[in-house]
Regions:
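A structural motif shared across PLP-dependent enzymes of the aminotransferase-like
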Residues: 97-110
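Mid-domain Rossmann-like dinucleotide-binding core that forms the NAD(H)/NADP(H) cofactor-binding site
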Residues: 121-196
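Glycine-rich phosphate-binding loop and adjacent beta-alpha segment
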Residues: 217-282, 323-337
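Glycine-rich beta-strand-centered segment in the early N-terminal region that forms part
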Residues: 24-40, 48-100
Length: 337
């Protein structure tokens, strides 16, 4: 009997569809996973949905289980939580996280899934990929006890960084964003909040994640002498001016890039990608992370949901996608050739 599933594809910039796909038979080292939830990483997936991945960055932007190529047709995504239905006996029945796109079922090597700890709800575990980005960023930044820190940009990545920093003893952590509706999120995470003009300065470290030229300029202004901006923003195909005049050199400021594709050099010889992801999942035992999930919709709603999410008409941090097995079975029958 042929195995099949339904997946979400970006057919062309700004247009998404749900398609039936055939699944391969699992090999001896594979698992079959039924998806419970997936998450839309709004910043990155908006770039993909709108066809704004720069030609020179397309190889770097590929997701681990992406199919197709930019700008489309392409199946993209990397925040997926499901239950193992077939495979190694130690994994069958376990809830797992995988860097897989939006699809109802899939077959992957067992090494590609990470068990979700029992004290982490499956619906929260979709944040693991973004919290992993935060972990890697803070391995890069290496903040110290008592540091004065600002996180500029209260999107999904910025909020994840702030959530992890909230546990740093003696630190002053402030989330900075032009959108005052992010203030309750900051409160839930246990950090301060300010609009850019009111942000506290004299920072040892500023993590910039707003993907805006104004945000980067303000990040530099908030630094103390010899402070550092850690740049986490992904600008896609936009060119951004960096204000290196005025006091940049005399104050000996630093702007450093960080990217989750490789483990931070500070840990690379001692931690693997799997170690980093497992740590992110353990951190998600904290209920405060629920504040990052700001919306929910069914899988079949993805084609109509992505345009307003990508344009910003529907504000969101992480939008959670829910998979209904009964609905899936009916849709698979409907999509049969």
């Amino acid at each position: 009997m042929e195995r099949s599933a339904l997946s979400f594809w970006v057919r062309s910039p700004g247009k998404g569809e749900i398609e039936r796909v055939a699944l391969p038979d699992p090999g001896p080292d594979d698992v079959v996973v039924r998806t419970l939830y997936s998450g839309i990483s709004r910043g990155t997936e908006s770039l993909v949905f709108e066809g704004r991945v720069p030609a020179g960055q397309r190889d770097l932007m590929r997701a681990p289980f992406q199919e197709g190529d930019f700008p489309g047709p392409v199946k993209y995504g990397y925040l997926n939580v499901g239950i193992v239905e077939e495979g190694a006996s130690a994994l069958v029945g376990r809830t797992v996280f995988c860097l897989y796109p939006h699809q109802t079922r899939y077959v992957v090597p067992a090494s590609a899934v990470t068990p979700v700890p029992e004290d982490v709800p499956p619906g929260r575990a979709i944040l693991a990929g973004t919290v992993e980005t935060a972990v890697n960023a803070l391995w890069d930044a290496a903040p110290l006890v008592g540091d004065r820190i600002a996180v500029v940009g209260a999107g999904m990545v910025g909020c994840s960084v702030a959530a992890v920093l909230a546990g740093l003893p003696g630190a002053r952590v402030q989330l900075v964003d032009v959108d005052t509706s992010r203030a309750p999120v900051a409160e839930a995470l246990g950090v301060g909040f300010a609009v850019p003009d009111d942000a506290e300065g004299d920072c040892d470290l500023v993590v910039h994640a707003s993907a805006s030229e104004a945000g980067l300029a303000r990040s530099l202004e908030l630094l103390a002498p010899e402070g550092e901006v850690l740049e986490l923003s992904w600008y896609g195909d936009r060119r951004v001016a960096v204000p290196l005049g005025e006091h940049f050199h005399s104050r000996r400021l630093t702007v450093r890039g960080s990217q989750v594709g490789a483990v931070s050099p500070s840990r690379r010889s001692r931690r693997t990608h799997a170690d980093r992801l497992a740590l992110a999942l353990r951190l998600l035992a904290a209920p405060a992370f629920d504040a990052l999930i700001t919306g929910e919709a069914g899988f079949t709603e993805l084609p109509r949901l992505m345009p307003p999410l990508a344009s910003g008409a529907l504000p969101a941090l992480c939008h959670r996608i829910v998979y209904d097995p009964v609905e899936e079975a009916a849709l698979v029958q409907r999509h049969r050739p």
